[in-house]
């Protein structure tokens, strides 16, 4: 032990021993935290530790415990000790009493000390003691020494004082606190060693203090709570007492305020220590005086209180409060707020005592008294110890040098030292460092009896003044265990092992008996977990088994509780009764007053209700008046709207008249036009003149037969002008007559209607000259077909919507003409129509044509012209621009066109395209904008290019022109310009922002480019650049996508700086008037400069004029008002709209025939179809009506109809293989024995091995040498096991103990012990026996002897030739023996080749042995390469590979059966029909397109075409877009490819397959629009042959039922609606039972009832039922179809909702703000206001008299009076 450690050990004043040294302390210390419990608890509560941590009572502790409060029995002794301490402090020269025990002489020494100018000396005894000699032995330790480093480096030993009074209470508290800190440091040291050194067995505190390792020396400087820097290791910081105490007081918050820090610093000054001592002395004197003369002190305090001034009292109170706060802060180490500035300690102790007495008397009950009382019982630590001040080198005025100190804290921990001196080590420097400048700590010590919950918690009875001997306990503890890997011998380990086995056996036995119920049974496979083991067990508690007295006490308590509850119930019931009686009498007292209040309240309620009724009546009358005024305003507004409509009609008529005049070149036509106009006006004045004119018309009609077409056209060119003037006259008459209809007009309309019904409409007769035919059939001329329309397939979806009646039919929709066979059949030309016609569409088209024809005949003059044309037998069908359709088809070289084709245009325009150019040129010449709405594929692009070429050639206007198109067709427009008008400089505006900025650079220069082509999206992105530039023509392609006037796109494009505007659309205009108004208003602002139409009508007026009549027409009811209104709308649209259909303008287009081919199901298809329908799951699915499940069922049935391999693949047949045959176990026993025992030479086989082990010969060990056997026995010593067995037999007697007894624990343990020993002995004997058997084996001769005796003869004799023939005589007689296996195989080979085709159901592997007998193993050896031992191979036949397997051919034929490839066709009825159809088509020179929905069907078709050897091409959804054009061009140019198989999901952009003239639909798509697009790929402009469409339908299946129902109800076109999304209309109209051909079931739910999906969700549902490839292809096709959706996505819809589109200047806005977005129909006539019938019941019968009086007086009814009163303005 080091000297430093010895010195530290002697610094303890009392040498007390911790409770851990007491007996049982080791166990108790394991239950508590060895580090934190005692110090933290002591600091937190200010009390001493509990019993288990309490030091043993020695002399010093007895003296400390006697210092009690004044109120306790030991108070007088405490007062004496306080007086002695006071005396010692007041007289520093007096030396303390010397101890009487044997101690060395101490020399007193005076040490001067200066505190605030005061000088005093303190005597310190220098004790010198000789160091005892070190003795060897485990029980003796070195005597501790203490070395105090000073200037002279003297060795000083502090004397242990025997008398407890010799130390002052302040010093005693200081020593106790230092001990606590030292103990904590020792425990931290021990805990550090336990955590760092896991295998720690013994712990020496003195040696631990010498630990200078790098782990422990990782020191970090930390600012301590008391303002100094404390040196603590990282490990010590976790267990710092000050930190733990502060965290407990402050809840973990350690940060102090500045004021608290300043107060602490002021409290820790040197002079404050002296002040504390003086105050302590004053307090003690005050306490002594209070006990003796309490009354006198109170009188003195009152006198002093009266004399002192108020300010002096407040200052002293603040000072006293600051002192108390600083004391608490020093004791708790927690920051507290100081209430005043710190005062200097200049006042005397007497004034301090007076101030404290004053504060005590003034603050009784408010907290100051508590502080005064605490000062009596608390003691403070003296920071400056006179005994250590002189000897230590610590200077309080200088910071403590931590680097010079070597820290050696000591911890007791669990393992206790051998002596008391080694346990406690105290250093003055350590105390001064931890508590510099006199830190004040308050220790409130109160002992509580320990809680005893275990017998081990009881303390040992040790005589007073004696110390228990802990060395024996420590040695016993250290010897109570041994380390298994270090301190135990083999014998001890075996004994330990035996004890553990016995313990486990006892535990298992107790578990079986149920004693240990908490533990799991190992036999059941359960065991304790690590967490359960670590959890441990609870300490035993007191037994809960009740005794008789417990029952008596419990009964008494229960009875007492019952009595108390009964008493409480009685009291509560009495209270309730008293309250009820009191409430009753109170109610009787105020009954009259309450009645009065209720009556007054009732009157108020009645008055309020009556006032509300009257006010409600006035409000109702006010609403009636407002409604009347509103109706009057609407009537006035309607009149203004009619007036405005008239102006618009007049402007439209003028524009149309100007157009017609421009078409007529000769002056003769103009003169005839004037004459006819005058004649029409005269005919309108008199009926007689009208009849004369009709006669003249008849004469003219007879002369028309002799006129040519040109003369007829010139003759009737002014019909439109006549019609316009007649319409103007009718409008003037309507305005003059008001709302009454003109009778003459009704009669005229009736006559026109009758004449129209009696006439026979005829189809226009195309009069085509041979030259014209050559023009359209010439291959050299560039025909402008529909190839330039890349979005034709996209526009085809909108054609299905044109069949609905309404505005679409009136603006150039399909006009199917009625055929009347009763009239003149000579003038009717029959068109070739489709084989499957849609009757409902024909009826709708006929109705539309009839309405259109009625609307166009709006004047009598037009009716006369129709009569004249009818007389000639040809009806001229007017189009939307007033030009007859007959003119469109009769443009021949004989008639010079009004507008010559521009020379910049390369190519020849068709007739209708030439007329389109003329119409567009007329729009430009008349300063009007328009809409070109030709059907898709008619060449709107080339007509637009020709218009721009016309402007460049005729008007010398090259641009700049802006063409805005969808993104997908930008490249197509550029290619068309380069193809047909290469003279234009075209700039395609696209790319990223940087590229677009480069293209805009210099574009304002003239002739940089002429035409700019861009997309809708880029226009919005670069709106600032496009809006600044002035454009001559702005052309919008796909203009139907800007029909929403609230969108940002519409509003942005509306304000572009343009001269003219043109809209292109292939979609017919819908019945939505708002969309129509949006397009028309988009065109109108351009006409504002010429004031032809000063702005278009606002949306409200437009809806009032046309919405109600259109709604009636859609609903089916057509009246005169509707017809008149629609005629006006048609007249407005005529100058701005041109729409033509294919069948009207293109008569050269080939016909289209559709055939339905019914295919029978094959036998396999019918089986699978019926089997699927008969399943219970299928029927249950159809009953539930779940849409997704039904779609899945339908998809499976369609797979069966297309090909059965799609539903269930034809399997590859193989045999079931078994190892043994069924008869193998039942073979005869004799045959089995013979096969094992008999060794045949020629036909049998010898055993492969000979075993002699059963005879005792270890022949298998002959490969081992004798030396190896000896070495093996040498290194496997069995003697050790034998010795171990003998030792165990000696230890455990062989005789068996008494029978196992469970009632005797000792006997049971003996039996268990003996059984365990016998078990171990038995196991060792078995090991010995096995070792002996293993070591007994040895070779008979050995390998070394055999090698010595072996002679190699291979080199002496040559090799013998192989024998190829058997030497047996019987083998040479071939006529007597059976044929060999090879001979049999050769003989049966032809039969096997021809007839071996049926694969057996099962085969076995041992049939060869059973069927071939003894030769079977030989065959297996030779042909299956099973090698036998060399000893048995006497005859060598040859290498096994050279012999052919005789069973190979039969195995190949019978082992596996692949389905024949020809079954692919014969398993499917559609493929059988397709084979014959393709044979006929190819023989006729036709080429076919085969479409299917499923991708797997394409795979089947590929196999089918490969079987037949036909060349084909394939296009499916996986084909890239760039490859599609290559495939289509190759197919169109290569006639050697007859078949093209495609998927309906392969997309529609850029596919033109006019090279084929036959379309075969192998199956129909879910979406019929897909099939329609497929037809359009072949049947389109450019096709020269008739197109035949074959649709394959499996009869008596779901496909035939769907087609049948579709033909009956016409629901096929209703599957698809707007935007290409699916709806449930198709499934709502057709039930599942109709599709499957089942009987109707009332329980089955319709599909629509269980389906509530939107279009997208429904599309996903259909995709789930399809294959993954088909679903992916459909997704790609939809994406391509909707490629331009993002261009027209209304991203700003919400922002622009309700926005009103304005004009380009300050002109009137198109909509009124209050009516923005209103779509309801306006009222055409004022609605009469119904007067509400309201009567007030007054409860009497005088109402009649009052009403009669009012009527007599002229006032009238009260309602009329109120209305009149409000109308006069008196109400507002």
UniProtKB/Swiss-Prot annotation:
Mark out the compositionally biased spans (Basic residues).
Answer: 107-121, 338-379
Q: Where is the HSA domain?
A: 536-609
Q: Which GO terms describe its molecular function?
A: ATP binding; ATP hydrolysis activity; DNA binding; helicase activity; histone binding; structural molecule activity
Q: Which Gene Ontology BP annotations are present? A: chromatin remodeling; recombinational repair
- List the gene name: SWR1
Binding positions for ATP per the UniProt entry: 934-941
Q: What is its EC number?
A: 3.6.4.12
- Protein name in UniProt: Helicase SWR1
Q: What does this protein do?
A: Catalytic component of the SWR1 complex which mediates the ATP-dependent exchange of histone H2A for the H2A variant HZT1 leading to transcriptional regulation of selected genes by chromatin remodeling.
Source domain of life: Eukaryota
């Amino acid at each position: 032990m080091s000297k430093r450690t010895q010195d530290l050990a002697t610094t303890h004043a009392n040498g007390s021993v911790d409770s851990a040294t007491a007996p049982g302390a080791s166990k108790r210390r394991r239950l508590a935290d060895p580090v934190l419990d005692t110090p933290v608890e002591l600091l937190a509560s200010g009390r001493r530790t509990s019993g288990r941590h309490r030091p043993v009572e020695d002399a010093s502790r007895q003296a400390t415990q006697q210092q009690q409060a004044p109120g306790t029995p030991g108070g007088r002794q405490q007062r004496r000790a306080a007086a002695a301490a006071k005396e010692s402090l007041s007289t520093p020269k007096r030396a303390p009493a010397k101890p009487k025990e044997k101690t060395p002489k101490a020399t007193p020494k005076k040490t001067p000390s200066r505190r605030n100018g005061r000088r005093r000396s303190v005597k310190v005894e220098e004790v010198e003691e000789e160091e005892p000699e070190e003795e060897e032995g485990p029980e003796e330790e070195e005597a501790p020494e203490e070395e105090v480093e000073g200037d002279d480096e003297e060795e000083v030993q502090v004397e242990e004082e025997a008398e407890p009074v010799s130390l002052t209470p302040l010093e005693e508290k200081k020593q106790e606190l230092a001990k606590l800190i030292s103990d904590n440091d020792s425990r931290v040291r021990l805990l550090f060693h336990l955590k760092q050194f896991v295998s720690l067995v013994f712990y020496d505190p003195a040696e631990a203090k010498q630990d200078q390792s790098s782990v422990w020396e990782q020191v970090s400087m930390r600012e301590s709570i008391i303002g100094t820097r404390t040196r603590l290791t990282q490990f010590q910081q976790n267990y710092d007492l000050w930190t733990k105490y502060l965290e407990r007081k402050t809840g973990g918050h350690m940060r102090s305020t500045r004021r608290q820090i300043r107060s602490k610093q002021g409290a820790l000054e040197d002079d404050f220590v002296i002040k504390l001592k003086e105050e302590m002395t004053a307090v003690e004197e005050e306490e002594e005086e209070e006990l003796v003369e309490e009354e006198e002190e109170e009188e003195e305090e009152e006198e002093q209180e009266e004399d002192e001034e108020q300010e002096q009292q407040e200052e002293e109170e603040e000072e006293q409060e600051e002192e108390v706060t600083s004391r608490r802060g020093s004791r708790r180490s927690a920051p507290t707020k100081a209430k005043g500035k710190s005062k200097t300690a200049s006042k005397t102790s007497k004034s301090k005592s007076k101030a404290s007495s004053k504060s005590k008397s003034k603050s009784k009950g408010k907290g100051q008294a508590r502080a005064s009382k605490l000062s009596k019982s608390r003691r403070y630590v003296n920071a400056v110890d006179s005994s250590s001040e002189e000897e230590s080198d610590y200077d309080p005025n200088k910071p403590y040098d931590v680097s010079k100190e070597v820290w050696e804290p000591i911890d007791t921990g669990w393992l206790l030292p051998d002596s008391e001196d080694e346990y406690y080590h105290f250093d003055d420097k350590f105390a001064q460092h931890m508590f510099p400048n006199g830190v004040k700590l308050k220790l409130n010590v109160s002992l509580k009896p320990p809680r005893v919950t275990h017998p081990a918690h009881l303390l040992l009875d040790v005589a007073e003044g004696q110390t228990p001997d802990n060395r024996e306990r420590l040695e016993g503890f250290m010897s109570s265990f041994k380390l298994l890997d270090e301190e135990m011998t083999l014998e001890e380990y075996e004994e330990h092992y035996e004890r553990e086995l016995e313990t486990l056996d006892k535990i298992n036995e107790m578990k079986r008996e149920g004693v240990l119920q908490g533990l799991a049974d190992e036999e059941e496979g359960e065991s304790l977990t690590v967490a359960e083991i670590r959890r441990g067990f609870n300490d035993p508690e007191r037994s809960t088994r009740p005794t008789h007295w417990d029952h008596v006490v419990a009964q008494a308590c229960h009875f007492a509780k019952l009595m108390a509850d009964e008493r409480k119930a009685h009291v509560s019931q009495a209270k309730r009764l008293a309250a009820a009686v009191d409430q009753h009498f109170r109610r009787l007292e105020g009954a009259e007053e309450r009645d009065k209040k209720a009556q007054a309240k009732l009157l108020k309620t009645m008055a309020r209700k009556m006032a509300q009724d009257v006010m409600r009546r006035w409000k109702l009358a006010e609403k009636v008046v407002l409604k009347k005024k509103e109706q009057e305003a609407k009537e006035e507004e309607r009149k203004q709207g009619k007036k405005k409509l008239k102006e618009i009609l007049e402007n439209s008529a003028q524009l149309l008249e100007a157009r017609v005049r421009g078409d007529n070149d000769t002056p003769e036509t103009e003169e005839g036009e004037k004459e006819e106009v005058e004649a029409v006006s005269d005919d309108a004045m008199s009926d007689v003149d009208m009849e004369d004119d009709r006669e003249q018309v008849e004469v003219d009609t007879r002369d028309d037969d002799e006129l040519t077409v040109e003369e007829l056209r010139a003759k009737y060119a002014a019909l439109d002008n006549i019609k316009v003037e007649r319409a103007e006259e009718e409008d003037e008459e309507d305005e003059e007559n008001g709302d009454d209809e003109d009778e003459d007009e009704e009669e005229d309309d009736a006559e026109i209607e009758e004449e129209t019904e009696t006439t026979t409409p005829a189809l226009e007769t195309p009069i085509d000259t041979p030259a014209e035919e050559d023009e359209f059939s010439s291959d050299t001329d560039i025909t402008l077909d529909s190839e330039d329309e890349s979005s034709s397939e996209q526009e085809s979806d909108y054609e299905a919507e044109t069949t609905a009646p309404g505005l679409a039919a009136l603006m150039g929709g399909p006009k199917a003409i009625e055929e009347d066979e009763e009239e003149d059949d000579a003038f009717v030309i029959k068109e070739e129509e489709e084989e499957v016609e849609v009757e409902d569409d024909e009826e709708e088209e006929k109705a539309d044509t009839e309405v259109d024809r009625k609307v166009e005949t709006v004047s009598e003059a037009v009716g006369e012209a129709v009569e004249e044309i009818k007389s000639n037998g040809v009806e001229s069908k007017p189009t939307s621009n007033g030009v007859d359709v007959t003119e469109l088809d009769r443009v021949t070289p004989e008639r010079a066109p009004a507008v010559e084709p521009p020379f910049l245009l390369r190519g020849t325009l068709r007739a209708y395209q030439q007329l389109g150019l003329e119409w567009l040129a007329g729009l430009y010449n008349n300063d009007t904008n328009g809409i070109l709405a030709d059907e898709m594929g008619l060449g709107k692009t080339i007509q637009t290019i020709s218009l721009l070429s016309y402007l460049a050639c005729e008007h010398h206007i090259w641009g700049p022109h802006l063409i805005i198109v969808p993104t997908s067709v930008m490249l197509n427009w550029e290619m068309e310009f380069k193809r047909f008008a290469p003279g234009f400089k075209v700039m395609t505006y696209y790319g990223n922002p940087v590229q677009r900025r480069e293209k805009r650079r210099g574009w304002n220069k003239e002739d940089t480019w002429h035409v700019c082509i861009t997309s809708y999206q880029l226009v919005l992105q670069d709106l600032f650049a496009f809006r600044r530039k002035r454009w001559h023509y702005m052309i919008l392609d796909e203009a139907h996508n800007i029909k929403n006037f609230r969108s940002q796109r519409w509003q942005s494009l509306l304000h572009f700086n343009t001269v003219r505007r043109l809209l292109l659309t292939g979609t017919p205009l819908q019945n939505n008037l708002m969309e129509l108004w949006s397009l028309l208003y988009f065109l109108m602002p351009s006409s504002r400069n010429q004031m032809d139409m000063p702005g278009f009508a606002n949306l409200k007026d437009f809806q009032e004029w046309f919405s109600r009549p259109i709604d009636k027409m859609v609903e089916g009811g057509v009246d005169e008002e509707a017809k008149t209104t629609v005629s006006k709308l048609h007249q407005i649209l005529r100058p701005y709209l041109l729409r033509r259909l294919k069948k009207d303008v293109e008569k050269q287009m080939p016909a289209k025939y559709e055939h339905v081919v019914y295919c029978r199901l094959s036998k396999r298809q019918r089986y699978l179809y019926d089997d699927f329908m008969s399943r219970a799951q299928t029927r249950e699915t159809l009953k539930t009506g779940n849409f997704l499940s039904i779609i899945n069922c339908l998809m499976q049935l369609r797979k069966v109809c297309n090909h059965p391999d799609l539903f269930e693949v034809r399997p590859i047949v193989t045999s079931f293989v078994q190892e043994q045959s069924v008869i193998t176990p039942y073979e005869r026993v004799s045959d089995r024995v013979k096969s094992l025992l008999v060794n045949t030479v020629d036909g049998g086989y010898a055993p492969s091995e000979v075993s002699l082990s059963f005879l005792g010969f270890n022949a298998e060990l002959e490969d081992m040498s004798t030396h190896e056997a000896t070495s093996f026995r040498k290194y496997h010593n069995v003697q050790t096991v034998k010795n171990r067995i003998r030792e165990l037999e000696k230890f455990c007697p062989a005789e068996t103990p008494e029978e196992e007894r469970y009632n005797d624990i000792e006997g049971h343990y003996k039996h268990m012990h003996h059984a365990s020993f016998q078990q171990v002995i038995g196991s060792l004997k078995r090991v010995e026996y096995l070792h002996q058997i293993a070591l007994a084996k040895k070779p008979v001769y050995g390998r070394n002897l055999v090698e010595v005796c072996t002679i190699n003869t291979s080199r002496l004799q040559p090799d013998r030739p192989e024998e190829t023939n058997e030497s047996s005589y019987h083998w040479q007689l071939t006529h007597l023996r059976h044929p060999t296996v090879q001979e049999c195989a050769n003989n049966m080979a032809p039969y096997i080749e021809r007839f071996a085709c049926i694969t057996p159901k099962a085969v076995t592997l041992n049939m060869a042995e059973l069927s071939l007998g003894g030769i079977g193993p030989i065959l297996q050896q030779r042909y299956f390469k099973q090698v036998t031992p060399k000893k048995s191979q006497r005859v060598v036949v040859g290498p096994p590979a050279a012999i052919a397997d005789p069973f190979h051919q039969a195995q190949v034929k019978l082992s596996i059966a692949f389905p024949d490839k020809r079954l692919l066709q014969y398993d499917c009825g559609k493929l059988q029909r397709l084979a014959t159809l393709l044979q006929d088509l190819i023989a006729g020179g036709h080429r076919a397109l085969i479409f299917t929905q499923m991708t797997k069907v394409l795979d089947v078709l590929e196999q089918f075409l490969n079987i037949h050897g036909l060349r084909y091409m394939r296009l499916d959804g996986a084909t890239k877009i760039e490859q599609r054009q290559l495939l289509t061009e190759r197919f169109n140019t290569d006639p050697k490819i007859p078949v093209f198989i495609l998927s309906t999901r392969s997309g529609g952009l850029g596919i033109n397959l006019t090279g084929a003239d036959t379309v075969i639909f192998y199956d129909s798509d879910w979406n019929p629009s897909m099939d329609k697009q497929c037809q359009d790929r072949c049947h389109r402009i450019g096709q020269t042959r008739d197109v035949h469409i074959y649709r394959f339908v499996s009869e008596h299946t779901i496909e035939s039922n769907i087609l049948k129902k579709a033909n009956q109800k016409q629901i096929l076109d209703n599957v698809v609606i707007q935007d290409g999304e699916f709806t449930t209309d198709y499934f709502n109209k057709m039930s599942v039972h109709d599709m499957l051909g089942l009987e109707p079931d009332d329980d089955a739910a319709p599909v629509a009832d269980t389906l509530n999906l939107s279009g997208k969700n429904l599309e996903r549902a259909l995709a789930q039922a399809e294959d993954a490839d088909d679903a992916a292809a459909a997704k790609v096709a939809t994406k391509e179809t909707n490629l331009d959706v993002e261009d027209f996505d209304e991203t700003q819809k919400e922002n622009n909702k309700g926005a009103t589109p304005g004009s380009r200047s300050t002109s009137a806005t198109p909509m009124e703000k209050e009516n923005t977005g209103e779509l309801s129909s306006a009222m055409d006539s004022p609605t009469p206001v119904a007067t509400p019938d309201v009567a007030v019941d007054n409860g009497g019968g005088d109402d009649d008299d009052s009403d009669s009086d009012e009527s007599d007086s002229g006032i009238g009814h009260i309602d009329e009076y109120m209305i009149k009163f409000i109308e006069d303005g008196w109400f507002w």
